[in-house]
Amino acid sequence: MTRTRLLAAVVAFAMPVAAVAAGPVLMHRDPGCPCCEKWAQQVKAQFGRAVRVVDDANRPAFMKARGVPADLASCHTAIIDGITFEGHVPIADMKRALATHPKGVTGLAVAGMPMGSPGMEMPGMKTQPYDVVAFGPGGRKVFAHH
């Protein structure tokens, strides 16, 4: 682990939750998607605030407006403190992005719905490996691998 990553992890976990996510949590989802509810419950528990859920039949337009690359699409898009989180992004990765605000990054995404990612946990099912991808005007890069 690089010193920068270690420092970012320490900062992310040492900060009070309220300082990490000062603004409201807004989540647009495909209407009626149950895994989005599971993910929102985890966000609520970890950030200590309600998640405003919007059933959005026109979510692709919302995603495009937020700069989410089409190939990174999932079933929900959340906004916290101006950062976009597409799909089943783990809470620890969200906290790290919110604490460090990586230069040129406007959001994080987990493409699709990988088994075992937050909200997609199912007893007896094998966890699939997946990447959390940081995206922004300058392109994209892997932010974390799970």
For each of these PLM feature ranges, what is it?
Residues 50, 68-69:
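Short coil/loop linkers at secondary-structure junctions
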